[in-house]
Amino acid sequence: MDKTLKFTDSHEWVRDNGDGTVTIGISEHAQEMLGDVVFVDLPDVEDEVEAGESFSLVESVKAASDIYSPVTGEVVEINEELEDSPELINEEPYEGGWIVKVKLSDPSELDDLKDAEEYLSSIEEE
C-alpha cells in the first residue's frame, strides 16, 4: 500500500496530487468486502462534492455501496474506464481503479484523514 495515501473511516482513499487536486478511490479492504464490482455510478465533471457526503455508488455482486467524499471541492476528472471496466476497482484499487479527481476547496481537510498506518490499525480491529 502507498504510504502517502490518506484514508477515511468509510474506506475511501485520497492521494494528494500536489497541484491542488486529489485522486479518490476505495480501499483494498472495501473492494474485498464488496466482492466483484459490476457497476460504478460516476458523478459529472464540474459537480461539487462535500466532505462526508455521498458522490458515487459502487454496485457489486453482493451489495450497492455509497462512496463518500473525503474532501470538499469540484470534480475535475472522472475515471471513464470504470464505465466499461468496473472490475478495475477490484484489480487495482489504488491505481487503475481510482474513481474521481477533485480540486480542493480546503486543503486543510486532508489533515483530518487517517494515514496508512492508522487506517490499517483500524481495519484490523473490525
From Swiss-Prot:
Protein keywords: Lipoyl
PROSITE patterns in the record: BIOTINYL_LIPOYL
SS bonds (residue pairs): none
Membrane found in the keyword field: no
Pfam families, per the entry: GCV_H
Cellular component terms (Gene Ontology): cytosol; glycine cleavage complex
Occurrences of domain Lipoyl-binding (ranges): 21-103
Cofactor(s) this protein cannot do without: (R)-lipoate
Entry's Gene Ontology BP terms: glycine decarboxylation via glycine cleavage system
Gene3D superfamilies listed in its UniProt record: 2.40.50.100
Domain of life: Bacteria
Cofactor note: Binds 1 lipoyl cofactor covalently.
Residues recorded with modification N6-lipoyllysine: K62
CDD domains, A to Z: GCS_H
Family stated for the protein in its record: Belongs to the GcvH family.
Subunit relationships: The glycine cleavage system is composed of four proteins: P, T, L and H.
Function: The glycine cleavage system catalyzes the degradation of glycine. The H protein shuttles the methylamine group of glycine from the P protein to the T protein.
Protein name: Glycine cleavage system H protein
Upper classification of the organism: Bacteria, Pseudomonadati, Pseudomonadota, Gammaproteobacteria, Vibrionales
